[in-house]
């Protein structure tokens, strides 16, 4: 979410006011006792130019936000900052407050995932309380009702404001150089759009939006950060509308400026951005996503180079680009990447095998790479067929001899009926796999398992052991419902609603055709004979 | 499953006239010796037996006294061995079990070390990028640093098995391994990720394992605060989710999003167990959560690989001496491949086979000495257990009678047992050599093991010249293991042949006869390598670029023929199946039917047949008289199930009940008899025989109970809400 920027490590100066605060509990020296200074950002204040340089493309938003905050100790109306993900909303707010050196309380509705945790998080920060082993990791006050929260928050904020006033008077006379904190406290609520998914989220949202009106404390400023626009939160209740501040998506030039910051070799990275920025901006403009992908691609981009400090010329740029080009299309489409660790022994073995069996590369890709029992494989194929084939074709498809070869001939289709078939086929593809009852699955399983048993029977007959055939048949059928449960656990089968007529559970196969082909190949099962092609 | 307490007595020895007077005297002395031994075990009843037998000896009829002595000795042996056999079973099985556990632990240790190395490397890089101050670490707003990526370092552990049974133990051992290395480890299962408790449920599970068991509210800031206390921050935090695919996707996504927000302040490593493919989380997690994962793949050994390791440790290396026959091995392989494919079930099968072996075979007590590998003990202490009754039983074993070994050579029994004990050594070496050769074709040790146990040694026919010529055209040869090994030999490259011969040489180092044969192949191997170097393409012998290439082909073909000769030599000389050795019943379990009935039970169709043909099982008088007619004396469930056959898949409950009621009330039969206008004497007889008609309430109660039993059995399904009048018949597996 936040753009990249350096944070300078500065030892925080201890002020006289922190020493004057009485500590109720004596804690070990190592641990940290929250003080009034912890309500500010905690590091040295930065200039407005530093804030602007940290956030290219956000100049107007920063100035608007500072204007809405107003001068020191000036009451302000609630502010709602909204925009897409990874547009710098939270970072800008925090950096501006760092620049202004004003106390604030921050809570994210993702970490605080229910009302009680949210309320107690705000109260703990206001009361300068930290959960630790000494207090049994409990909150300062228990609070799970909005009405209790209003009263407790008013008390806590009144106490903080009194402390701020006394601190302000002291610091004026003793330290004229330090920037004053003022007497305003800002409440920052991040990710408020997540509240809508909570239990009774609508009530909580209305409460938070009316908090300014209910509290009636001019020393409190409320800042709401949301991923959704204010129109989503409209309701009939009367409350003060927060002032909206929109953070649009970054432009391509803004992204270039963002990624070029803090690069040791700007020319080399600029050449890299010339290659990758335009195609990736069409997919996403999230800095978070692009940053992860670009760091991976930049390492690949620099592989042919020995010295990372050089300025590339045109010929070198072309060479680096051709080296990188095969990866770009791949990374554009991929969301989830799994890298291999060098300690993974299996990967080494596989690589060695691939090197020695170059002709078998295709076979290895087609081999099923996890273990399933034979009955689970047949059951998976049964589910695949039950989802793909129409139910009316089961009788002709799964007769004793099996397969579509029994059809003597097909009628010649006219153009009209072929057109209808194509339309029906497209509709079926759009709908996805169909659902089927459990009885149909087990009936198909029984048919194709007997087909599979005949291949086992051939093996047994060759070994002159006819009793094995019967035992194999018994083996496949036992514990079949347990196999159904296993396929459901592995997400190969999902339960999809109930039949409106009989109320029984219907299943749906989530197996891709590639996986079904792999399973059928491992069983030597003629899947294409049983699969209906429109 | 409980073994029978009494063992069937071995057949009595009939006294023949061939015994001379001195032999008879010796035979009389031996029972006294055994009785004396038994009485030392504090058996009070035996003292009375001794006294009684003494009196009988003094009696005037000596033949009767001798028979009674023999019978008492036999009973005593049965009881004594029955107790001893279970002790030996516990000894043997505990050794097998420990061997299996060690093998399974070693098979995963490399992956576990890899995971730990990955965690430590990543943890060091996180720390080196900048340590946070205490106040920064516990604040609620995010840290704005250059490396403030919210990526969550994740290991995808690929279990490669659809079933989760084996992997539960694996992840428990992974947890112990990481904890022993100093990591803070918490393990969550799919039950923690339920949609009902939401993300709070799994957070509470985490905090209970890390912080304290009584956390009021599950809050991530508690974890951050705990991490900064008492030097907890010197070690990484690891969260293991062992069955990712079973978790509730939205809840897991929420947890990942929350943890990634705090990934800078608390270095969290996520380990997810995936069973099908390493990109399986793509189906479960949301796009936002997928973007937060910086995933690295680790692969566990597959069930087939672990099976091979277990087989090698239990049956091929000196472990316990216990082994199984060809049919039992085939059944166990089929059970592993066709049922659930878990090693847990295979070990359970092995334990049942071992237990049944000790409960059925009296001489299985000898396995204790095999277990300890004490040759001297076998010749000394072991023979004390060999009473005359057990000697009779030993020489009546099928393998002994087939080899025409008579009782006159019973002094040779220790010699036979010694050979039986030493036999597995060259046998296992040959099996391992075959396994090395079969690795190039990805053959599994389980398949090799099943084939070479064949007592008829059918695999030897593949070495005949006509078979070698015809092997190319046999399509069904794919399923044969030895044939596949021989065909694969022709496709090996010189480097592969060389590596195989080196491994063979290592395996046969302790066995001179085979090792000499392998060493003899070295000159031919060097000739092949020389030809390959001259060609300049050692790994591509199939090319026909020049005449020297054809020379390389000739050298290679000669080499493979000699290797096949060595394989044939090994198989013929040392691959004797255990079932062809005398006295092998002592340590080899052969009863495959008992094992199958213990494991599989009856198929579902058996239930239906039993209900339809109850007369064939009960053999009752009333049913045989009336043929297939339904009678009130039949069991209610059978009556109902037979009536259900008259209906289609959907059965109307009211009609079903009326038919059932008609069967039970004898008044209808009276009416039928009257309508047939039978004689008066028959009428009176039936009136006297028929019981009173049961009450309506009783008929309904019996009907409901029978329907419930059919439902429990799984043969019918109860009415649904929309059709309360009908039940549905579940018809499959018939």
From Swiss-Prot, chain A:
Region described as Disordered: 1-36, 397-428
Motif Nuclear localization signal, residue numbers: 129-136
InterPro entries: AAA_16 (IPR041664), ORC5 (IPR020796), ORC5_C (IPR047088), ORC5_lid (IPR048866), P-loop_NTPase (IPR027417)
Family annotation (SUPFAM superfamilies): P-loop containing nucleoside triphosphate hydrolases
Location within or outside the cell: Nucleus
Cellular component per GO, a single term: nucleus
Keyword check for Lyase: no
Gene3D superfamilies named in the record: P-loop containing nucleotide triphosphate hydrolases (3.40.50.300)
Free-text tissue specificity from the UniProt record: Follow a cell-cycle regulation with a peak at the G1/S-phase. Mostly expressed in flower buds and cauline leaves, and, to a lower exent, in roots, leaves and stems. Expressed at low levels ubiquitously.
Record keywords, A-Z: ATP-binding, DNA replication, Nucleotide-binding, Nucleus
Chain sites annotated for binding ATP: 83-90
UniProt GO MF annotations: ATP binding
Top-rank taxon, per record: Eukaryota
Induction: Accumulates 13 hours after cell cycle reactivation by sucrose addition following cell cycle arrest mediated by sucrose deprivation.
Biased composition (Basic and acidic residues): 414-424
A GO biological-process term: DNA replication
General function of this protein: Component of the origin recognition complex (ORC) that binds origins of replication. DNA-binding is ATP-dependent. The specific DNA sequences that define origins of replication have not been identified yet. ORC is required to assemble the pre-replication complex necessary to initiate DNA replication.
Sequence similarity: Belongs to the ORC5 family.
Description of how the protein assembles with itself and partners: Component of the origin recognition complex (ORC) composed of at least ORC1 (ORC1A or ORC1B), ORC2, ORC3, ORC4, ORC5 and ORC6. ORC is regulated in a cell-cycle and development dependent manner. It is sequentially assembled at the exit from anaphase of mitosis and disassembled as cells enter S phase. Interacts directly with ORC1A, ORC1B, ORC2, ORC3, ORC4 and ORC6.
Protein name listed in UniProt: Origin of replication complex subunit 5
Organism: Arabidopsis thaliana (Mouse-ear cress)
From Swiss-Prot, chain B:
Subcellular location: Nucleus
Renumbered residue ranges of the record's region Disordered: 1-25, 532-554
InterPro entries: ORC3, ORC3_N, ORC_WH_C
Induction record: Regulated by E2F. Accumulates rapidly after cell cycle reactivation by sucrose addition following cell cycle arrest mediated by sucrose deprivation.
This protein's record includes keyword Nucleus: yes
Gene Ontology BP term (one): DNA replication
Cellular component, GO annotation: nuclear origin of replication recognition complex; origin recognition complex
Pfam families linked to this entry: ORC3_N, ORC_WH_C
Expression by tissue: Follow a cell-cycle regulation with a peak at the G1/S-phase. Mostly expressed in siliques and flowers, and, to a lower exent, in flower buds, leaves, roots and stems.
Keywords recorded for this protein, A-Z: DNA replication, DNA-binding, Nucleus
Keyword match DNA-binding: yes
Molecular function in Gene Ontology: DNA binding
Listed Polar residues bias regions: 12-24
Stated role: Component of the origin recognition complex (ORC) that binds origins of replication. DNA-binding is ATP-dependent. The specific DNA sequences that define origins of replication have not been identified yet.
Entry's family note: Belongs to the ORC3 family.
Subunit organization: Component of the origin recognition complex (ORC) composed of at least ORC1 (ORC1A or ORC1B), ORC2, ORC3, ORC4, ORC5 and ORC6. ORC is regulated in a cell-cycle and development dependent manner. It is sequentially assembled at the exit from anaphase of mitosis and disassembled as cells enter S phase. Interacts directly with ORC1A, ORC2, ORC4, ORC5 and ORC6.
Listed name of the protein: Origin of replication complex subunit 3
Origin species: Arabidopsis thaliana
Gene name of the record: ORC3
